[in-house]
Amino acid sequence: MDITESEFTIFEVTPDPNELNNKRIKEIKGGKVNIKELFRYAGVFEIILLIIGIIGSIGVGCLNPLLMILTGDVVDTFVNGENFSKEGGSIKITTEEMNYEIMNSISDTINKLVLKMLYFAIGNMVAGFLQTICFFVLSEYQGIKIRSLYFKALLRQDPGWFDCHKTGELTSKIINDIQKIQDGMSLKFGRLFQTFSSFITGYLIGFIKCWDLTLVVLCMFPFIMVSMMGLGMSAGIFTMKSHKPFSEACSIAEQTIGNIRTVHSLTQERSFCESYNTKIMETDKYNIKKSIGIGTGLGCMMFFIMSSNALGSWYGNFVVRGKGGSDNVKAGTVLTVFMSVLLATQSLSQISTPINILNSAKVAAFNVYQTIDRIPDIDCQSIGGECPTECNGNIRFEDVQFVYPTRLSHHVLKGLDLEIKKGQTIALVGASGCGKSTTIQLIQRNYDPNGGRVTLDGKDIRELNIKWLRNQIGLVGQEPVLFAGTIRENIMLGAKEGATPSEEEMIECAKMANAHDFISKLPEGYDTIIGEKGALLSGGQKQRIAIARALIRNPSILLLDEATSALDTQSEKIVQEALEKASKGRTTIIVAHRLTTVRNADKICVFHQGEIIEQGKHQELMDLKGTYYGLVKRQSMEEEVDQETVENDLKKFREQEDKEVENISLEQTNLHNENSIVKQIKQEYKEEQKKLKHSNRFVLFRVIWNNYKHEYIFCTLGLIGGIGAGAAFPFYSLNFVDLIRVLMKLHPGINLTDEQANSILRSCMIIICIGIITMISFFCYVGLFMAAGEKMIGRIRRRFYYSIMHQNVSWFDRRENMVGAVTTKLTSDPTSLQGISAERVGDIIEIMSTVGFGFGIGLYFSWKLSLCILAVFPIISFFMFINGQLNSKNAAPAKAAYEQCGVTLVEVVEAMKTVQSLGKEDYFSQKYNNDLQIPKRGIIKWGPLLSITNAITNLLTFSINAYGYYLGICFMKKTINYQQDVPNFVDEIIDTFGDIQKALMTINSATTSFAQIGNVLPDVGKAVGAAKSIYNIIDRKPSIDCYSEEGETFNDVKGEIEFKNIHFRYPTRADNEVLKGISFKAEQGKTIALVGASGCGKSTTIQLIERFYDPTSGEVLLDGHNIKDLNIHFLRNQIGLVGQEPVLFAESVIDNIKRGVPEGVEVSNEQIYAAAKMANAHDFISAMPEGYNTMVGDRGSQLSGGQKQRIAIARALIRNPKVLLLDEATSALDSESEKIVQDALDKASKGRTTIVIAHRLSTIQNADKIYVIMRGKIVEQGKHQELIDLKGFYYTLAMQQFGTVN
């Protein structure tokens, strides 16, 4: 049956049948969501907060233009004073009395206006408090809720969906995109309403006070709107374009950091850095274009705003003289119109940042909400489907056909028919990639078949509740997946939903899996933390814990996919017996390459290219002498051994092992008395942290200086632009007061004098010039500084990744440096640096420029008033400082909590099939939600305090006008000359007021600008924390430096490896000595083998040769050179490594093989094909539709275990290494492939030193020397036959593995 892509629909995004979700999906087509959709997850409480926050924002926005009415009234008070002098001319009082009367009248009126200004200030404080606290709480709550929903949605998705998405892309959404959504709902969203309300109120006041003057000012409004629309479009388009390369960069980072050992062993650090840099630079390219677009739009907008003011200034003299459309217009009215309209249009100039942030949030929400909305066909959260009262375990495959969603043209199963009866044990055998593991996945319903059906007890499993189905199944996979935490937690994860096994039951399962003994000997026993993915355990130890986890489930169906592949022979024998016991009374399906483990199966099915070609019991198939017979014969050893002899030897072996265990226990007891090494390791760690803390003292200046150093042209122009933009408003205010002073002396029906006309024209021309300067300044300060900031963030992100790849393996072993935590830092910390990037530095420069010029001008015109107002600044600064400190205190624990969330996220996404097979979606969802409680508690603790300090700052800033006018009138009353003629007295009042108004308006622009620092401080607090986190890693100098150019190199490398009295402890487990004085030699061109029980230290020797770690004492030599003295890349380039768990990267087959090529070496396609042929990989690669260009999926998910292993072998062989390290290199291969690959490896070993770690002794019987390791010591050594003749440990292992094979 041919399956076309159009027919394959089960993995497409499936809309929710619910009408609401259908509506949502329609609404979000187009790359970003609308405002309503952005807040779709807001509950009643959050909606109330949103409404109150919007009201507060509108209040803050309205009060500033309304304050201009009072300011205009102040001006008109002086104009009225002049009128009063004319009216009082007929009254017979002395000139001095008249002057006092005029002054007192003005003073009384202004004092009343000052009181009203104070009421406005209090209103602004209340509105500001509501705005801050509501949006702070709203954004934090929504961020936590969306993180939780997204994580839950990921847990819900089917494996087919994950096959089509890279882990890095998914994790970047929760780390980066949700932060953008949160920013879009924060106070920055409130600023949108603040600016729009300010805009509307300002123009409304203008039309009410003087409609014709406002219309003249509005002439430029269409141009302002076009500039603003261009700004918004630039932000939206380039934000969307930057998303794809950034996600791809995150994917590269997550893959490489998660597989750092493989990256180091292949010396591919620089290559991956180049790939990462390419994606980040592509992201930077779009972000820089966005910045230039925003800067250009904002510069043009400011020019048109100033031009409109120039037009208004020119027309102002007509309306005051009664020649306009409005009647009774005074200078104060002109001032009110101008200032309110100026504030309205100026508010638009501040809208770029919130619009940019909102656009980013809407684009990010589109990506995140799509995942949350998606309801898969295979929905593990569904409550639908049958839940039978019992499960008998009768399984049937009926004409099942299947293709994977990412390889639609490759048929994995072709009409599979198979019946498995209750309680039967069925074995599936065959070559790698023939479909065995696929059948296991179909039984769990990880995928649905494209044709036919799978039934359980006669019911199609698609009709069963999926949680109920998976609850009946226990699975032990080919590559054991454990989770960061304790051994106890990992075993307990196997328990059925709602069940709580006792301690005794858990220990019994561990004993059945032959895990109890090694667990008991660990310092913390079952409470031992095993590290990320169980990194602190050997492969065999992980496998045994996974088996214990499956057994504690007591399932009706047991699925064993190469369950004992990673075990040593002794453990395999014991565990196999346990599994056979566990299989009784339940249906068991075994996938195995070691055919000794399936002899007792009720039925053995031989697969070939997706079809069963033979089936029957072991002896029936042996008698058939077909494919199965050939597979068995290939695995048989030549020796035939009497079973009774084997049992006696096993007994003897166990007795000897018990004695060895007793000795080890004594050694471990002695370890507690030998604390010098442990103390040394811990002391080194403390000193490292102390150095890093010292280097963090000047981190803020380092970030700023590093940015300026690399972008000095952009930054210099931005610096000049920032100063120009900051100076524009004080000088505009100065010029505007001169204009108002002229208008105050105009009267209806009176023509302009030449001096007045020239003065008005000069003011208009100055405003035009300020507009041109402002346009250029804003382009430089916003556009170029923002572009420099984006380049800085990109550069630091690249350097940060480079430094992470720089770290030695032991650094990644630390709990705080797990993959999720490190990728979270890499994604979020550089983004947080925007708080101290060039853009923010530009904001601060503009603010300080405004403050400097404002107070400079103020001091020149009224030094007393300026100094009195300046005295308020320390109080404002104090509250700003407190606000910044509170922001830092809030940000630090939240940052740590989100990093821990990142750890859980990456861990779960990478192991999603295991999580879903265990049915532990709710467990991990709860664990993730528990991590989110820390930032949630911070909201309640810090939100009110932040809002109060911010509100007090607003109160003080808003009160400056009232304070200034009150002081100004007091100074005038004391300094003015009352003894002159009334007209001269009035002129002096107006001139003196003009100077005070100049000082006050310029100072007011300074204080308003200074208050904007409060908006910058929260971002600065986050940025400083992020910078410390980044530079902690950048400044760290690892003891094993993979980038180091130092160290010896030499020609004619022979490849002789020698261990001299090696002792070793892992830095994270300093209390446990792994190797205890090991010495051995692998001579040039020879093959040595290391055998022994899981966890005895075999794989550790491989890691020491690769120099992932340095020994605690002793020496590892290459051709007589201590490897510590060799250049690290030179050393690793001499080595080819194939590990126990093959690691491939999410790229094509050919690119994965090329990863083995040392840096600077070119290889042809023919050489790649030759390496693949040697690894027995060429045929299956060529059979795939895309051949060598086939994408292998995230971590090789589109290939079988055996296929991945063969590509990994080809990758090692293409290095043409002098030393070949094979750590269970053929463990995942079927017997046919193993034989071919083993022959290839035997050939490849000629002329090079080969060190083999193997549990299958058949693969190492031809080794030149075999070393038997037990508990970190070599207990036997010799050739295969010598050790067999010795009849010691090795002999017993061999007998235990092969017994009486005919």
Swiss-Prot record:
Gene Ontology molecular function: any one: ATPase-coupled transmembrane transporter activity
Catalytic activity: ATP + H2O + xenobioticSide 1 = ADP + phosphate + xenobioticSide 2
Sites where the protein binds ATP: 430-437, 1092-1099
Keywords noted in UniProt: ATP-binding, Glycoprotein, Membrane, Nucleotide-binding, Repeat, Translocase, Transmembrane, Transmembrane helix, Transport
Gene3D superfamilies for this protein: ABC transporter type 1, transmembrane domain, P-loop containing nucleotide triphosphate hydrolases
UniProt key word Ribonucleoprotein: no
Transmembrane parts of this sequence: 43-63, 118-138, 192-212, 213-233, 292-312, 331-351, 712-732, 765-785, 841-861, 862-882
Classification via PROSITE patterns: ABC_TM1F (PS50929), ABC_TRANSPORTER_1 (PS00211), ABC_TRANSPORTER_2 (PS50893)
Residues bearing attached sugar chains per UniProt: 83, 663, 751, 808
Domain ABC transmembrane type-1: start-end pairs: 51-360, 713-1022
Membrane-topology annotation of the record: Multi-pass membrane protein
Location within or outside the cell: Membrane
Top-rank taxon: Eukaryota
EC numbers for this chain: 7.6.2.2
Domain ABC transporter: 395-634, 1057-1296
Pfam families, alphabetized: ABC_membrane (PF00664), ABC_tran (PF00005)
Claim: Glycoprotein is one of the keywords in the record: yes
GO CC annotation terms, alphabetical: membrane
GO BP annotation list: transmembrane transport
SUPFAM superfamilies: ABC transporter transmembrane region, P-loop containing nucleoside triphosphate hydrolases
Enzyme class: translocase
Chief subcellular location: membrane
Functional summary from the UniProt entry: Energy-dependent efflux pump responsible for decreased drug accumulation in multidrug resistance parasites.
Family recorded in the similarity comment: Belongs to the ABC transporter superfamily. ABCB family. Multidrug resistance exporter (TC 3.A.1.201) subfamily.
Name of protein: Multidrug resistance protein 1
Species this protein is from: Entamoeba histolytica (strain ATCC 30459 / HM-1:IMSS / ABRM)
